[in-house]
């Protein structure tokens, strides 16, 4: 695996590697389907690293697309959710899901919002004010969002200015 798609400004020499094996957890989100169908707002999923947020997001994407029949735009910046290779998703994320992989989140959300007319937008690991700005824009357009953040509990979100703004939205 090379570093060609990543915008490095320094040497792209690799000194260490961390290997994460993504896996599908069928029906992981099935109990949330009725709630998602009736929830009028967007959803923020918080948890510490390794808690299963990305696995939950993957299954929620499939549920919203296939079970609820909604148009979904999936922002998969690091190829973790759909695991696209050669233009094909290796994980089932739904028949009505448009995937943009390998593109910075804020840029990908803007492109998907303007070109794919999503009813839902799914985004993993919000970490930048630019991400939140585009999420607000999507919300103003009537797009429902599901996003994840790293936080062990609600207090962690409230103490971080970036995430505090999400709780107020």
Role assignments for model-derived ranges:
Residues 1-40:
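P-loop NTP-binding catalytic core
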Residues 24-28, 99-107, 126:
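A general structural motif
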Residues 37, 64-112:
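P-loop NTPase switch/communication element
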Residues 45:
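Hydrophobic anchor at the beta1->P-loop junction of P-loop NTPases
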Residues 49:
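The conserved Walker
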Residues 52-53:
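Conserved glycine(s) of the Walker
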Residues 56, 60:
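Hydrophobic positions on the alpha1 helix immediately C-terminal to the Walker A/P-loop
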Residues 116-169:
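Conserved P-loop NTPase nucleotide-binding/switch module
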């Amino acid at each position: 695996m090379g570093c060609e798609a990543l915008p490095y400004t320094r040497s792209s020499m690799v000194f260490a590697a961390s290997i994460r094996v993504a896996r599908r957890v069928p029906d992981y989100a099935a109990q949330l389907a009725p709630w998602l169908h009736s929830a009028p707002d967007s959803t923020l999923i918080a948890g510490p690293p390794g808690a299963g947020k990305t696995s939950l997001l993957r299954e929620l994407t499939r549920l919203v697309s296939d079970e609820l029949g909604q148009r979904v735009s999936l922002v998969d910046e690091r190829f973790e959710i759909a695991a696209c290779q050669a233009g094909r998703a290796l994980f089932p994320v739904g028949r009505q899901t448009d995937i943009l992989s390998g593109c910075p989140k804020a840029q990908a959300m803007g492109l998907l919002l303007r070109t794919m007319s999503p009813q839902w937008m799914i985004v993993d690991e919000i970490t930048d004010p630019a991400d939140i700005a585009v999420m607000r824009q999507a919300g103003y357009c009537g797009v429902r969002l599901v996003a994840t953040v790293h936080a062990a509990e609600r207090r962690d979100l409230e103490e971080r200015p970036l995430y505090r703004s999400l709780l107020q939205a």
